[in-house]
Amino acid sequence: MNELEQIISIMEQFQKEQQQMKNDINNLYNTVKNSLIMQKNSTTDMNERVLPALKLMIDGLGNNLKYEIADYITHNNHLFFPKIESHKTTINNIINEGKSLARFGDGEFSIIYGTNRWSFQQYDEQLSERLLQVLQSDNDKLMIAIADNYGDLSKYTSESKSEIRAYMTDETRKKHETLLNKNKTYHDAYITRWYMMMNDKKTEAPANRLSNLKKIWNNKNVIAVEGEFTRLGVGNNLFDNAASFKRIIAPGTNSFRKYDDILDACLKYGSKNDLFLLAIGPSSGVLAYDLVQNDYQAIDVGHIDLEYMWYLAGAENRTSIPGSIPKFV
């Protein structure tokens, strides 16, 4: 592709992004309009709920715009863009190279900062130190995954883009930049958020992503390490292609308080051929790290089956699933 063709390609991509921005603004307008209709008789609700939410959405769109545009143009050297491998590459590394995965999202970062975004895991200084250790570790068998929030957001739904923009403030970006290595290649934390966030629900893409995900545990002896109410695979057939499926049950909240017991149980009941699927909140990343140190393969999957249940239901919005904890993590 010559230079002129590259310029035309960039302009076409930018034009598409402009249209998506217009769609987002239109959705924002409709949200505000509907809120005004619903709240027209309540000045208190308008002042306390609607206007702050509106300001958050507008600020998020404005603050994030330069990153989304710059991502199309050359990864502007003045802006921070961590290198993140694709969903497909991340899964291929798990399947073909036997690599493990520790995921870092807003909750893990907040604990590292010394704050808390979750009700099911209180801040713990030792957990904060361990998460930072894992985030900055350099073990070829453990992939460190972060959320693909830093630049182009065109693959996400309008609601997801608004949430990302509200979170990715300049302050948040500066904190991430101090913690992340610009020379390191990270992986896609959203491999377990493969349905609800994405704007391609009406295509074959979700089914393809699901098919790739299921290859991770195909014919594997799986040990799920989960909170007592998580119930991975209960009420669905997500893990039916596993050779076997056993569980180690951890506390449903503040699992790190029992971390040593959880790790001991994994080492006692697991074998080197087992695949550990971890769903114990921010402790999952630490456990993945420690299991890799002991030559096990472990994947932090979060509430992966909640996405599967939404997919089966053809859900367009997040809804509670009977029998599962109603947390959207």
In which residue ranges do the predicted regions lie?
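A short, acidic, amphipathic alpha-helical segment used as a generic capping/interface helix at domain edges
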Residues: 85-87, 125-135, 257-269, 273, ...
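Electropositive, gly/pro-rich neighborhoods at or near active sites that engage anionic ligands
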Residues: 30-32, 37-238
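Residues at the C-termini of beta-strands that transition into short coil/loop
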Residues: 148, 249-251, 302
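Residues at the starts of beta-strands that form the adenosine-phosphate
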Residues: 221, 244, 297
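C-terminal functional extensions of proteins
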Residues: 279, 283-329
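A mid-sequence, solvent-exposed acidic-amphipathic segment
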Residues: 227-273
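Structural motif
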Residues: 221, 274-275
